[in-house]
Amino acid sequence: PCPGLDQSTVTVTVVNPPDPGTNGAVSVCSNGAALSLFAQLGGAPQAGGTWSGPSAVVGGMFTPGTMSAGNYTYSLPAAAPCPAVSSTVAVTVNQPPDPGSSGAVTMCSTGAAIDLIAQLGGTPDAGGTWSGPSAVVGGMIDPATMSAGVYTYTVAGTAPCPDQTATV
């Protein structure tokens, strides 16, 4: 070294920022099982954050029957000099279809046609399909032209809710 030249040392430390993963989305059925919100995040999220959203989150779990749909935010605190970060899971809650409850009817072979949906209990969703021993047209059964037997009313579910059925 040159005489009279001073030296200084600078230490550079690089800190990796916290990783909350990437945003996610999930659809659940309102009568479905609880699920982990953390598992819905993409990437490799770092554990140890906190959840916030339209409903209180306990243990990182979303329970469809008791929690509201909406955006749930996973937040990790700052790791100086890196700022706090967060990712969001958008939760959609779908209602299961309601085909009503099964019913029964006894008809005279010379009787008038009847509306099958009126034979179901409860409040069946409209728009379902009928199947049975004879083709059902307009939801009506005509004892003079159709076969006796079990007729099934099927209402399609919105994923992940499965289709539901009731019978007459």
Give residue ranges: language-model regions.
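Proline- and Ser/Thr-rich low-complexity, intrinsically disordered segments
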Residues: P1-V168
